[in-house]
Every structure is written in structure tokens, then in C-alpha cells.
């Protein structure tokens, strides 16, 4: 990534998108499985500010590696605690995978018609793939 203002802005948008989708789907899945904790704490939202961790954000800026604020989950609310905890944990990485797939399809369609893909789509796709790889470790 270069350090011109446009690249920095595109990187920031990609990070906010990936982080927000990832954390939102942890919260959404927990809520659907019976745990209202994240909803009660205002985390069941697509507002990126609700999901930013100050230290994780600074690390993203400095090292291009960081994290969001962990979504609070209380397995005591789940009907099947072991299974539901795994589903909640998997929801974030799965959301990144689905997003990467969607942006990959968009990128391929644009290439097929010889339309240059927006740097945002390329950066977002690369970021989502990296996020998936990190979550699989």
C-alpha cells in the first residue's frame, strides 16, 4: 500500500467494512441463538464505531494487522451452549469469506467486460482474504 491520501482512505474504508461485518455477525448470530448480551450493549449494529478497539485500530494503522472490540457473549443463554458457541465464533470468519467471495465475483465481472475494478474493491477483497486466513489459524 502506498501512503498517498487516496490509498490511505481506501484502506481505512476496507478495514472498517471488514471489521464491522465480522463483529456484527458475531453479535447477530449470538442474538439469533438466544443471547441478548451484545444487543443490550449496543453491539448489534452496523455502526463501525461500536466495533472499533482503540489498540486494535492503532495496530491496523501501524502494522496493517489489528482487531475489533470483542463481542460479549454469554453461553448461559444458549439452548445448546457448545454448538452455539462454535456457531457464534464461526460467524465472523464466515461473513468475511462471503464478503470476499462477493467482491471476487464483482471483480471478475468487471474484468470480463474490460472495466477496471475500483482500487477499493481490490483492496477490500485482499483484506478480506487476509482476514479469513488469519481467522483460520
Model-inferred region functions:
Residues 1-137:
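Hydrophobic transmembrane alpha-helices and their immediate loop junctions
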